[in-house]
């Protein structure tokens, strides 16, 4: 839907809300849909961590095993189901099917599965595995023992990849034009960050106050879980209504319903035929990545972030679990961290990111994330090593024990890392694709966003599994983890410096090519230059 309004925005309007009046009927439900998707994601993220870390015997050591042996197979199965449904049904039916599956499972877990969890858990099998396997595989044994918690963790994690990445962004990319996307997406990302603030505060408040008292609740944590699950269910129903509204707004009403169904079935069949080709092209994707130093550097940057954030988070959550031993307290703490991540992300996006990149360039913007993670990581591990030796650094001044100070420093490290990732890291990564040719963009994004990021997440878990087998616990392997993190971040910073030089060189070449006098019309040159500038500004 193109806007018929051509009047330019005022400077303030262009900065705060660059949306035409005729576009509000599409933008507002899309913005609200993004908000509720993010809202549910944040609530689920905190609850899944609380369940598996506090509710199990292994603490944070179970997370690396869940990410490899739970999430990876789950993602493969869901992708296959998504492809099967997408090849046979229209996009709205696929959305409703997945929403019904997710909401139905979360409701069923909170109301039925969790109260009878003790009788469902595989205690006898886990006891036998405990006799056979080394102590370092305790996380794997716990994953098997508390299988219902593990499935909840996997389903909550898949909410992000399925509902947010596949369904929501798939819809957004399908119904928005390129010019609309440049103006819509920045505000939609702000909506996602705002949902983090709201979800964090509501989750924290529900841990302190009883919203609705349930007579069948097993304990205080079950009561909190029931209230949060009802919120998730209501939010999901609102999402279904918003999706239906967007779907009806964007379909072409001039086409008769019978022909519209045939057209959607034809598109689904075409998608199925196209999905048979990628296996032949997968090798070309990686060859393309390896043959280009620029794309290989971007892949290393994305891989480094995913490795570093996962290695940091397991250590931090292990420290937090030693302080907050109850479900309600742990969930409340994680909820406050979620709120702070949203606040930092919004403030950084509005006040820092665009201005910093415009003033000091791509390299400085891309260095912000690794430098912030390096400095905060050094402080975090410094407080951990001090706590192990019972040395009080600032604890006496702040009124904290060494362990509490280590957990607090880790929380701030996570807030700053996530905040800079959602702003500086994501935007500079997207900007790095702009000077590339269309072929490099398509192949590079497919390989980096689709495969490399997943390898990074799984790679961090595999590193932990190896260390746990050798050292038996996270605490015993801290020295090695710190060294691995330091090496990764140094490599990350060096690669950013190299890519920065290449980025400016490629950008200058692209502009020089556009300015060549061989072009038949100067207006074409101007339009091409403006399109490049608009693409770069859309990212900022």
From Swiss-Prot:
Does the record's keyword annotation contain Cytoplasm? no
Q: How does it sit in the membrane?
A: Multi-pass membrane protein
Q: Does the keyword Transit peptide apply?
A: no
Q: Name one GO cellular component term.
A: plasma membrane
Cite the entry's keywords alphabetically: ATP-binding, Cell membrane, Membrane, Nucleotide-binding, Transmembrane, Transmembrane helix, Transport
Source domain of life is Bacteria
Q: Which residues cross the membrane?
A: 24-44, 62-82, 94-114, 151-171, 223-243, 295-315, 337-357, 367-387, 391-411, 458-478, 480-500
Where, per UniProt, does this protein localize? Cell membrane
Q: What is its main location?
A: membrane
Q: Name one GO molecular function term.
A: ATP binding
InterPro entries, per this entry? ADP_ATP_car_bac_type, MFS_trans_sf
The record, for NCBIfam families, names:
AAA
The family line of this record is: Belongs to the ADP/ATP translocase tlc family.
Protein name (Swiss-Prot/TrEMBL): ADP,ATP carrier protein 2
GN (gene name): tlcB
